[in-house]
């Protein structure tokens, strides 16, 4: 429904090595097998058939007693299926300028992002990083309910995100989606240059799509999205969005996921 409403294209996973999982599929019935796989309905059907043929079935006293030869068991085969796994790494500025209204926008948007990506990937993991001047990994509940009073150093989140990718989500086996939300404030122009270097040289070559959503705040300068647009905006796997309020969420999701990455 989301895809139809926003006219989103289906995602095409990167040409990566897929993880192969094995599943047992029941394919029929056979005469031998473990008791745990006995097919009781077919066993009783075979016993009834035998009793009807031999004339031992009594309709007045319809007792069906299967013999050893009547027993039937499910047959199976192991089927190998490729599974394409993905991870979303959410990052969010939790400094004082990101209030409850901004976090609510991020929460709603992340719900729909999760919903869309789960449609395309059986194995979807989500990780959460919060940052002010220092970044740390947290659980989902902490992600949406933490507020700090310090300044903002965005590079700390990007460094932690890249370390996470290097350690656990190699691009040969994973489709990686980092999403970062902030109000556009950063500690300094020098730190913004560090962010750009991390993105351009280290993160973008390893991910399917990097998305930055700038949530409007009365306290944020809004400069960061401008800097990203000038430096990494032309990259094919970068998507930048400015989110003025809740009414802009749908347009932001379409901007993020409209590339089919």
Model-derived segments and spans:
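Acidic, glycine-rich A-domain
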Residues: 38, 43, 67-68, 75-89, ...
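Acidic/polar low-complexity segments with low predicted structural confidence
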Residues: 1-84
């Amino acid at each position: 429904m989301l895809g139809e409403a926003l006219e989103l294209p289906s995602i095409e996973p990167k040409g990566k090595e897929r993880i192969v999982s094995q599943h047992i599929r029941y394919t029929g019935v056979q005469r031998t097998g473990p008791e745990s796989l006995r097919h009781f309905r077919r066993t009783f059907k075979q016993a009834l058939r035998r009793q009807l043929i031999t004339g031992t079935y009594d309709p007045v006293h319809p007792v069906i007693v299967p013999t050893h030869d009547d027993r039937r068991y499910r047959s199976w085969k192991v089927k190998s299926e490729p599974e394409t796994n993905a991870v979303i790494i959410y990052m969010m500025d939790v400094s004082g300028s990101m209030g409850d209204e901004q976090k609510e926008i991020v929460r709603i948007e992340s719900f729909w992002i999760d919903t869309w990506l789960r449609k395309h990937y059986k194995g979807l993991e989500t990780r959460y990083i919060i940052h002010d001047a220092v970044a740390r990994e947290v659980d989902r509940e902490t992600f949406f309910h933490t507020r700090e009073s310090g300044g903002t150093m965005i590079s700390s989140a990007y460094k932690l995100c890249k370390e996470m990718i290097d350690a656990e989500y190699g691009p040969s086996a994973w489709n990686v989606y980092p999403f970062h939300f902030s109000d556009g404030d950063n500690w300094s122009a020098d730190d913004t240059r560090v962010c750009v270097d991390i993105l351009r040289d280290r993160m973008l070559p390893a991910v399917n799509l990097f998305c930055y959503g700038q949530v409007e705040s009365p306290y944020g300068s809004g400069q960061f999205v401008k800097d990203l647009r000038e430096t990494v905006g032309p990259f094919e796997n970068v998507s930048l969005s400015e989110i003025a309020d809740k009414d802009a969420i749908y347009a932001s999701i379409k901007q993020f996921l409209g590339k089919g990455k």
